[in-house]
UniProtKB/Swiss-Prot annotation:
Protein name: Elongation factor P
Function: Involved in peptide bond synthesis. Stimulates efficient translation and peptide-bond synthesis on native or reconstituted 70S ribosomes in vitro. Probably functions indirectly by altering the affinity of the ribosome for aminoacyl-tRNA, thus increasing their reactivity as acceptors for peptidyl transferase.
GO molecular function: translation elongation factor activity
UniProt keywords, alphabetically: Cytoplasm, Elongation factor, Protein biosynthesis
Organism of this sequence: Paenarthrobacter aurescens (strain TC1)
Annotated CDD domains: S1_EF-P_repeat_1, S1_EF-P_repeat_2
One Gene Ontology cellular component annotation held by this UniProt entry: cytoplasm
NCBIfam families: efp, PRK00529.1
Primary site of residence: cytoplasm
GO terms of biological process kind: peptide biosynthetic process
Subcellular location: Cytoplasm
Gene3D superfamilies: 2.30.30.30, Nucleic acid-binding proteins
Pathway(s) served: Protein biosynthesis; polypeptide chain elongation
Family according to the record: Belongs to the elongation factor P family.
Length: 187
């Protein structure tokens, strides 16, 4: 049995018969009153995100989660097929479980999949990925109504904001947590 002091990002809790993945947490010790833990967590089955506050030191039940490296192979309709890099077994993961990770996944890319009792719970991507710009309008230096960014579509079909100097065919580094542009990548 763990306590709320053991909560960190990626922890999976069992609450009211449901599994919840901790997305964000913050231990708070106010000057007056008892300490508490503020969390943002996602229901593993429904995908619903809720904010919940726990008293510090409260006993909680955590789920045993196995995290393994998998290679993304291909998309099969709404599902995604991954291969375990250790024993070469293939697993199929639903599009709902993969979620927004599809915006940053390329074939043969390595990802980390959290599995509980044989069921994939969620996909963990690396903090950043390198993607190629497949479409963007030419950016004119004097044509500015904002801070000098323009929309660009990457090879996965996801649209990001890039600086005006980025052109079609450029490889860029993208933050997988929020989809923001991190910089150009030189080959």
């Amino acid at each position: 049995m763990a306590t709320t002091n053991d909560i960190k990002n990626g922890t999976v809790l069992k609450l009211e018969g449901q599994l919840w993945n901790i997305i964000e947490f913050q231990h708070v010790k106010p000057g007056k009153g008892g300490a508490f833990v503020r969390t943002k967590m996602r229901n593993v089955m429904s995908g619903k995100v809720v904010d919940k506050t726990f008293n510090a030191g409260l006993k909680i039940e955590t789920a045993t989660v196995d995290r393994r490296d998998y290679q993304y192979l291909y998309q099969d309709g709404e599902d995604f097929v991954f291969m375990d890099t250790q024993d070469y077994d293939q697993i199929t993961v639903s599009g709902a479980t993969v979620g927004d990770a599809t915006n940053f996944m390329l074939e043969n890319q390595m990802v980390n999949i959290a599995i509980h009792e044989g069921t994939p719970l969620y996909i963990e991507l690396p903090p950043s990925v390198v993607l190629e710009i497949t479409y963007t309008e030419p950016g004119l230096q004097g044509d500015r109504s904002s801070a000098g960014t323009k929309p660009a579509t990457v090879e996965t079909g996801y649209e990001i904001q890039v600086p005006l100097f980025v052109e079609q065919g450029t490889k860029v580094k993208v933050d997988t947590r929020d989809g923001s542009y991190l910089g150009r990548v030189n080959d």
